[in-house]
Structures are given as structure tokens and as C-alpha cells.
Amino acid sequence: MLAFSASLCFKENAALKAFLVSFLTLLAAASLCAAQQTDSTSATPTAATYLKLAGEVDGALHNDVLNLWFPRAIDHEHGGYHSHFGRDWQREPSDGKFSVFQGRMTWVTSQVVLREPDKKAEYLPYIKQGLDFLENTMWDKQDGGFFWGLDDNGEVTPEFGDGKQLYGIDFCIYGAAAAYQATGDKRALELAKRGFYWLDEHAHDTVNAGYFETLTRDGKPVLPHAPAGQIEAGPVGPVGYKSMNAHIHLLEALTELYRVWPDATLRARVEETLAVVRDKICVEPGAMNLYFTNDWRAIPGPDSYGHDVETAYLMLETDELLHTQASEKTERMARMLVDHALAYGWDKANGGFFENGPTFGPPEDTRKEWWVQCEGLNALLMMHQRYGKQDPIYFQRFLEQWTFIKNHTIDSRYHGTINMTTAEGKPLTEDKGSIWKAGYHDGRAFWNVSARLRELAQNP
């Protein structure tokens, strides 16, 4: 009896084991099939997929960028645009008028007219608001050039100083050039040209290429000074040195101006700046140094993943404008920048790009900033459009990036983009607008992504 029971038990266990093995095998097969279907969707998305995503991005562009900033940011009392808004988009006390913010918002309003003609009547006055302020207030009538920043009444302040910064001049030229393209107002073009001429006369480094970044009010370059070995910290980087950040945006600004004014000297400077960014600032295997001596010797520092992916886009945009098709050299470096950022700066658990880290190794700052996520979205889809048939990874990461933006970067309660979150997406900041946070990174990314998705839908 005992032997019979043991035998029966063995047979029942064997049958159960066989059933479990079969069940788990089927479950694994089903999971693999589902995974393959997901991967297949990512690798070969349909026109319907692209159009659905384009609709979502359009919604974010209008509900979380344009409809929040305008007309809310129009400063009827002082001119220009007000920058400081709380999480609920209530106006906060002014932080003054900052060249970067004023130029960027002039560019944004101009892009609305260029890309969405049905809004032209509404936005033309908003462009004029920015252009008038750049011309009548930000431009230094005494010594020329654009001020770095002023108070609301257009006066020099200790916080901003009376000097000039390449980074700020970049965006004033950028905004004025876009305003001309959108409106045909010749004073916008003349202002952009005046800014370029002043910058080229005072800041162009004719020996080493590139531009000096910190200037006195009358346009004299401020060179490095290190009493006791300590370099003065400037608003963009160490005073007297050249930076990645100011030069990638110089490339952006000069490209925008060349789009409407194909001047020979300007073209030479655009070509030079592209070469500086691609061949001196960018390095294999796809990282960028942040700061340089004036003869372009790199100063050690971390790699900024957001600037990597943004620069990939900016280089290709410039090269295509200059030569119709980007060179193999530019294509190669742009792809390396995105691939390196994915390899070292991508959050595989939550999606999205971290803030920064060493060239080789895990990230040091795992926070996630709104502009990094938006520039990442733009760059990933750009890479998918170019190389998606070879490698599905770009579209897979694009979908993950968009999911993170929808779920965490965009504020579901008050709308708009949250400046900074944890890696998991928990908000770390409250303000929706500041002198450094305009509607530029997210607006541009959403416009570009929407247009690119519709192009892809035509030829999936």
C-alpha cells in the first residue's frame, strides 16, 4: 500500500511537473511574441503610429507651451517679455530683463507665425513686443552690442553688470533674424546684422578661431585672470575662457541669420564655427568638452548629455543649410554624440537622459532637466529618420523618452514643463518660468518632432 501510494504520488508529481513545464513554455513563448511585436512596432512603425504621436506632440506644444506663455508673458508696462512664473503660472516678481530670454521668446513668437499661419494676426504684435525691446532697450546705444541683462526699466544693475556676453548676443541675433523671416520688417534684419558686425569686430578671434566670450561694455575681451590660482566664475563659465555652450548657440544664431542674409563674411563665420564645434569641441567617442583655453586646449570637466544631443541637431541643421546635404564628417560626429549619450547618459529603468557624467562611466548627476528631455526627443527622432532602418534603438528610445515627458516632465495639474525632476520623475522645482527657462527648448523640440513625424508618416 505504501509502495502504491508512493508510486501514485510520483506519477501525480510527474504529471504536475510536465503540466507546469508546458505552461511555462507557452507563457514564455507568448511573452517573447509580445516582445517581438513591441520591438517590431518600434522598428517598423506605421503611418498611423507616427500620426498618433504627432497629434500628442501637437497637444503638448499648444497646451504646455504656447497657450501658457502667450499672452501671459507680454509685459505691457515695461516692454519685452516677463519671465518669472510659479508652478500655477501666476506671475512672480520680476528678475529683470535678460538678453537670452528676450531673444529666445522673440524667436518663439516668430516661429508661431512661420509654422502656424492661422495664428499670424495674434502673434505679430507679440513679435513686435520682443523686437522693439531688443532694439530700443537691450541694444547699448552708447557702446553698441547687446547688454547681458537690465532691470525692468532698462537700467544697468549690479546683478547683470554692464558688460557683454557672447551667449547673450547669440540669442539677440537669433531672435532678430527670426523676426525678420516672420515679418519682413527690415529693422529686424538691420538689428541682427548690427549685432553680428559688432560681435565680429570686437570678439572674433582671428588667430585661433571662435569668439571671445566675456567683453567689457565697450567690447574689449576680458582675458583669464587667476589671483592665487582661482579663476573668476562667469555666468556661462570661467571668465576669459571659451565654452562649448556659447559656441554651439553662436552656431545656431549665425545659421539663423544666414538663412535670411546669405552674406559672404557671415558664411565664412558659419563655416568656421561649425568646424570649431565639430572638430575642436566634439571629440570621439561622442562627447564634448565644456571649457577651453583661447587656443582651444580642453579644460577637464564632465560630459553634458543634453548638450551632446542638442549639438547633434544643431550641426546637422547648419551643414544642411550651407551644403544642402550634411557632410559625412558631420553626420558621423552627430551620430556619435547621440550614441554616446545613450550609452552613458540614458536611464534604462525610467527612460530619459540624465544630467551629466564622465566621458566613460556612470552618470554623476542623475537629475532630469526639462530641456534635456526635449532636446533628447528631437535628436532621437532625427536619428531614427536617418538610421531607423538599420537600428530600431532610436525609435524605441524615442518612445520611452516621450513617455517620460508625458508622465513626468509635463505637469498634469497646471500644465507646462517642470524644470527639474529626480531620475524617477519626482519634481524638484516649482517655477515654470525664469530668465533661463523660456518656451524655446520645448517649443522648438515639439515643432520639429511633429513635423518629422508627419514626414515619416508619408514614407513609413
What is each of the regions a protein language model found here?
Residues 5-7, 22:
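Serine residues within intrinsically disordered or low-complexity segments
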Residues 19-31:
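Bacterial N-terminal signal peptides
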Residues 36-460:
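Glycan-recognition and catalytic cores of secretory/periplasmic carbohydrate-active enzymes
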